[in-house]
């Protein structure tokens, strides 16, 4: 007899009521007396467990009664509806077969574990309630993102993970080399001779697929990328990881306004999709992780996002009377405390901050007519601060070259990027959404290490 997923039983209970069925899964809890016992089984298909009742008439009753948590079992039995019990139904077992035993020292016993402890056993933590919910939501959110863009005719573009350019101009990149670290070989200037390296030049893991994405947007009009990115920032905060995933759409014949409309529509779509398709997980997060989560997400999904320029935001912050840890001044970047004040205290909903000073933004952003600011936007959301950053891209070749010269960038390294402005340049825009930050926002989890399956952070590359 073919086994049935627990999710199917929950979603189609009437179909299986009174039927003999087979399920396969892992023991979450087990309690037994001399005459009968109860097992909570989880098969990974659904957040909730299913209860199995077994009685002393079972052929291997004594053996089953002593099984440890996380033992893999195959259960055959009749599905009985239990309207007067805590659970809606249970399986009355006629046979229980052990697929794989679990040692008694299994670390995830039935008690509350700290997230710090669970990070030490990242290979086992998806079996816990919290992380079962986190990674199921992560999967659904990823699907929602693809569905959102596919429904709108966007082309999914795979940009390279190994790159010779720095899209952010920040320089905090992981270098890739096959040169011998003890004897890399030097050139006449006494510097490492990268012409002898695998790619014949300095290469790194990508910090963004944006530049390559622009090339494809200027061919396909609307594209998006969704893949891993890497930052060699020696940061130990709860918001930073060295390896994370980014969603980066690029849209041609579009300006900053179009960019903001797309970002707002996308974020609302993801929220609505996850709340609709993972109600049990979202209720769990709302009850045990972040008690105001569902109200906050519903507020985001139903609000018209605010709009404020950077200059206006600075004035609001300066006149607020608040004492901030970081001083507020025009020309300095907004810190998380400033972002959260704006979105939580002033607007009380998500807000786009636009038109930042050019000196604190990347070289590729379009210069505004005032000559001092660029057509950039950051989306701030309550509880986190900045979640999306984007801009209209500079489509004027002369202005782009001027900006690169001012920032000391080597134009030869970006020759192909500059060429995009020579052959049918068009206004275009795009943004980046850090996927893990989106998952943190959806789940209420407060540390990025807890929304990545095997986090990579400074001095930590276990598993």
UniProtKB/Swiss-Prot annotation:
Pfam annotation, one family: tRNA_anti-codon
Subcellular localization, as worded in the UniProt entry: Cytoplasm
Alphabetical UniProt keywords: Aminoacyl-tRNA synthetase, ATP-binding, Cytoplasm, Ligase, Nucleotide-binding, Protein biosynthesis
Gene3D superfamilies in the record: Bira Bifunctional Protein, Domain 2, Nucleic acid-binding proteins
Family: Belongs to the class-II aminoacyl-tRNA synthetase family.
PANTHER family according to UniProt: ASPARAGINE--TRNA LIGASE, MITOCHONDRIAL-RELATED (PTHR22594:SF34), ASPARTYL/LYSYL-TRNA SYNTHETASE (PTHR22594)
The name this protein goes by in its record: Asparagine--tRNA ligase
């Amino acid at each position: 007899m073919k086994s049935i997923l627990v999710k199917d039983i929950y979603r189609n209970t009437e179909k299986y009521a009174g039927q003999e069925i087979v399920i396969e899964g892992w023991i979450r809890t087990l309690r037994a007396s001399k005459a009968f016992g109860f097992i909570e089984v989880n098969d990974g298909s659904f957040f909730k467990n299913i209860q199995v009742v077994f009685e002393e008439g079972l052929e291997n009753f004594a053996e089953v009664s002593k099984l440890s948590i996380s033992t893999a079992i195959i259960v055959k039995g009749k599905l009985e509806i239990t309207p007067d019990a805590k659970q809606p139904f249970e399986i009355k077992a006629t046979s229980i077969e052990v697929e794989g035993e679990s040692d008694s020292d299994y670390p995830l016993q039935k008690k509350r574990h700290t997230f710090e402890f669970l990070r030490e056993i990242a290979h086992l933590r998806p079996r816990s309630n919290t992380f079962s919910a986190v990674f199921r939501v992560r999967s659904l959110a990823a699907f929602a993102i693809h569905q959102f863009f596919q429904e709108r005719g966007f082309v999914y573009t795979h940009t390279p993970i190994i790159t010779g350019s720095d899209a952010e101009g920040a320089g905090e990149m992981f270098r890739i080399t096959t040169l011998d670290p003890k004897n890399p070989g030097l050139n006449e200037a006494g510097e490492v001779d990268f012409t002898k390296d695998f790619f014949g030049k300095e290469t790194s893991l990508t910090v963004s697929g944006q530049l390559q994405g622009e090339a494809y947007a200027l061919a396909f009009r609307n594209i998006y990328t969704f893949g891993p990115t890497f930052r060699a920032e020696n940061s130990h905060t709860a918001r930073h990881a060295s390896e994370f995933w980014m969603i980066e759409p690029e849209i041609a014949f579009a300006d900053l306004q179009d960019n903001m409309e797309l970002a707002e529509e996308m974020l609302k779509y993801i929220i609505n999709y996850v709340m609709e398709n993972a109600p049990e997980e979202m209720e769990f997060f709302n009850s045990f992780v972040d008690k105001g989560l569902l109200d906050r997400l519903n507020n985001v999904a139903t609000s018209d996002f605010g709009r404020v320029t950077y200059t206006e935001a600075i004035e609001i912050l300066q006149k607020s009377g608040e004492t901030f840890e970081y001083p507020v001044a025009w020309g300095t970047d907004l810190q998380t405390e400033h972002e959260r004040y704006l979105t939580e205290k002033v607007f009380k909903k998500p807000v786009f901050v636009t038109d930042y000073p050019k000196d604190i933004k990347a070289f590729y952003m379009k210069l505004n007519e005032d000559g001092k600011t660029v057509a950039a936007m950051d989306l701030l959301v309550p509880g986190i601060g900045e979640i999306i950053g984007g801009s209209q891209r500079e489509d004027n070749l002369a202005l782009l070259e001027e900006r690169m010269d001012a920032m000391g960038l080597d134009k030869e390294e970006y020759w192909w990027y500059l060429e995009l402005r020579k052959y049918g340049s068009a206004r275009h825009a795009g943004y980046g959404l850090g996927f893990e930050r989106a998952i943190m926002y959806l789940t209420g989890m407060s540390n990025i290490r807890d929304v990545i399956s095997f986090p990579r952070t400074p001095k930590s590359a276990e598993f």
